[in-house]
Regions:
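Basic, Lys/Arg-enriched alpha-helical interface segments
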Residues: 1-62, 70-78, 84-87
Length: 87
């Protein structure tokens, strides 16, 4: 599977790193997704609705979310941040 990141995701990630988030936690989740394996239940992976339809939401930490889309052979990282940052 190929990996891509939106420009907004890259900005979001810079903000998360400035806030002291551990990038290794995000990398571990992305590696599972790239391998095509389901995420452990603690990540609360679920589809989104409304304007986010077609995307998935999972928790890196309780208030650190990753929004992504898997389409064909591509994992696209679209947004990351807290609930208040994203919704």
């Amino acid at each position: 599977m190929n990996l891509s990141q939106t420009a907004q995701f890259k900005k979001d990630m810079k903000r998360q790193l400035r806030q002291g988030k551990d990038q290794k936690k995000l990398i571990a989740v992305v590696e599972i997704l790239l391998a095509g394996r389901p995420l452990p239940a603690k990540h609360k992976d679920h589809p989104l609705k409304g304007s986010w339809r077609g995307r998935q939401d999972c928790h890196i930490e309780p208030d650190w979310i990753l929004i992504y889309r898997i389409k064909e052979n591509e994992l696209r990282l679209e947004r990351t941040g807290s609930h208040s940052d994203l919704f």
